[in-house]
Amino acid sequence: MTFTENIYKQINSLSPITTDDFSIYWLGQSRSYYSSNKARELEASNSALVKLMNKLLEQRDVLMTKNSHQFLISLAQKYEMIAKQVGGEIANRSIKSSIANEKVRRI
């Protein structure tokens, strides 16, 4: 299972969404982006992950705004935890890219 599939399943367990909606509203891509990537076992692009992280944090902020209901606060915290996973993936990709670029420069 790819990182993106794992994230989709986590979000879908909190608030059921279609793969088309995930592609459009969460990844900021075309309707078939996620399904196509999944079929080819490809990860989402860095750009799509940044959009995803922003959407997750937006969901968290909406749920936390003037809210004291424990269920909604808990849901907001779950969105934040997923956003941190996405941020970690973006950071790991940046590090790998930097290391790869350094090796290429040496050649």
Which positions does each model-derived feature cover?
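Short alpha-helical "recognition helix" segments of helix-turn-helix
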Residues: F22-S23
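Recognition helix of helix-turn-helix/homeodomain-like DNA-binding domains
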Residues: L27-N46
